[in-house]
Swiss-Prot record:
Zinc finger map (C3H1-type): 355-380
EC number: 3.1.-.-
Pfam family, one: Regnase_1_C
Gene behind this protein: ZC3H12B
UniProt record similarity statement: Belongs to the ZC3H12 family.
Name assigned to this protein: Probable ribonuclease ZC3H12B
Bias kind Basic and acidic residues: ranges: 8-28
Example of a GO MF term: RNA endonuclease activity
Lineage, highest ranks first: Eukaryota, Metazoa, Chordata, Craniata, Vertebrata
RNase NYN domain: residues covered: 190-345
Amino acid sequence: MTATAEVETPKMEKSASKEEKQQPKQDSTEQGNADSEEWMSSESDPEQISLKSSDNSKSCQPRDGQLKKKEMHSKPHRQLCRSPCLDRPSFSQSSILQDGKLDLEKEYQAKMEFALKLGYAEEQIQSVLNKLGPESLINDVLAELVRLGNKGDSEGQINLSLLVPRGPSSREIASPELSLEDEIDNSDNLRPVVIDGSNVAMSHGNKEEFSCRGIQLAVDWFLDKGHKDITVFVPAWRKEQSRPDAPITDQDILRKLEKEKILVFTPSRRVQGRRVVCYDDRFIVKLAFDSDGIIVSNDNYRDLQVEKPEWKKFIEERLLMYSFVNDKFMPPDDPLGRHGPSLENFLRKRPIVPEHKKQPCPYGKKCTYGHKCKYYHPERANQPQRSVADELRISAKLSTVKTMSEGTLAKCGTGMSSAKGEITSEVKRVAPKRQSDPSIRSVAMEPEEWLSIARKPEASSVPSLVTALSVPTIPPPKSHAVGALNTRSASSPVPGSSHFPHQKASLEHMASMQYPPILVTNSHGTPISYAEQYPKFESMGDHGYYSMLGDFSKLNINSMHNREYYMAEVDRGVYARNPNLCSDSRVSHTRNDNYSSYNNVYLAVADTHPEGNLKLHRSASQNRLQPFPHGYHEALTRVQSYGPEDSKQGPHKQSVPHLALHAQHPSTGTRSSCPADYPMPPNIHPGATPQPGRALVMTRMDSISDSRLYESNPVRQRRPPLCREQHASWDPLPCTTDSYGYHSYPLSNSLMQPCYEPVMVRSVPEKMEQLWRNPWVGMCNDSREHMIPEHQYQTYKNLCNIFPSNIVLAVMEKNPHTADAQQLAALIVAKLRAAR
């Protein structure tokens, strides 16, 4: 052993000496390389030098002594290289370090603020940032925060509320469980439950058997909800053994529930072999009412609702119905309907979880379901839950009512039946704001009253309508606005009444004149639109004050055969002429009242009152009649029919000159229903009347007169008004300014057909006042001259000297507005040639 050791030692020494010899050479080469590297890069990393040295050491595998020597050589080199950087830092490097620290602080604060905005606690955020470091990404921080939050919720640590102090998230997560536990524990808030055992058992047994298992299922459902006060009523006879007519299953459940003091048997007994059963429903309702609980049953207890009113209301509000789905007891979530409380609130004395009832709509204001949306809309809290169509209907009704109440007034007139005296209701006529109109007063007034009203220039703003015939009247001595004649008092285009021969041509000429449909005048004679001032009628059956059109279909034309029938009556002197007509009509027409020419223009008789006769006689004597230059004018006025009682009062007091003067006028009367014994003036003879064909006869249909004409005297007959029997005037006024005074023309067979079309009228021009100031005169016996207007009479006479008078008259009747004699002559020649 020793020999081998000795042999080994010299070998080792020799090898060591060889390594020592090689080491200086390697060191010198390494130093040269190191010096060159230092010159190349004075700031090279020390790690590279250490790596090189380590590589060299590994390759050479130095011993411990050799490693020490190597370290001695490397240490001073490191100090020389790194001494300027580490021991003596420059100013630029220190500023860079300070800027880096500031950037880290800013990032830290930014992440802290961002996490705080999300609702996380400051302590939690700090712990996460300290764990991950300030240089961590924001996504990593958020992920760690979320992980910590979920971990705290899963572990159920309540102390983690420090992590989420802001926002309702932590409270919302923990509140449902806690609130439900509190409610379950708080049994005082749950209502007592009274179960109709018979109803529940039979429902579970599908109406075929009494299934006690259904009662157990219902009880278990309420026990799971936390109810402790549960009572089940079952008749006592259900404890008996099952019979084929009354099968019972699982009777042991009844005994079990009875021991638990949940089930109660209602009394029943046998009397002489018969079972006497107490009414268990009364027990159920009474206990539930007294304990302020709920009733679990599908029975409505209609018989008990009648017994007590309080029970009726209680049953309606506290009855909980149910269903069995196989072996599952299922009450409805809305026991009282869609708009009633939820099941949770229904089972409790104090409602909870109101957010379930008023859950906000997820669409918010963008919801398009409207009033049908089952979710809660806070912006619609005060709005009615109606559809858009219902809202439009209601708004339309309100606007209509408002318009009617503000801008219109319904005016109604009443007419009396002529024979039976029956009162007929008038159709409403709309007129704007007529309450203060003095014309809407009763017409039952004395002549003195309406005479005083007639002399007021501004008595009324209601204009009267003007007839196309433009009958001149005598104005009063005082100057005031001249009222217009009422159309209904001037014309009657009914079968049997006369159309002038010139009317057809007048109607044709009217189209070229472009007259407005209906014109009226105000108190100063200015024409204004009738349609604008007064709206149209709502019904053709209306007896309104301003109507110009009549419902001609109401006329009874069966009793009117031909014009000879009426002419014969005129020849027999059936009708008399009122001598004081001029003064009467003068007073009437000067009124602007809408009743003026409608009430007071009479033909054949005036008021029978003595004072009225005296007044009319006085007014007639004050205005002496002077003849026209050609004096062939006929008065065109209203007609009137009287009953037999009027005929007994005798004729009016009149002077003989007046009677003689007016005796030359043709008679104008009403229908043949007027009594034939009506007296005529003594000095008027039938022969004094002209031919029937020359007379302007105005008739009234079926002896119907205006009821307003008789209101001053209750003895007179009351008849419906004339306004629905007659149409408007026959034709408009002539267009020339000097042709307003028309004379009556003879009757023409071609114009005897009834006129069913409404005719237009015009208002009275102011220039007509001058013509109306001329009094009337009697008629001449010349049958042709009284047909021609004054301004055409000379032309007519000249043409008659050349052509046949009948042809001249026919042409002038056909062309009443043609005043040129040459044009008329050309027309006459053309007619003569056509006749050949």
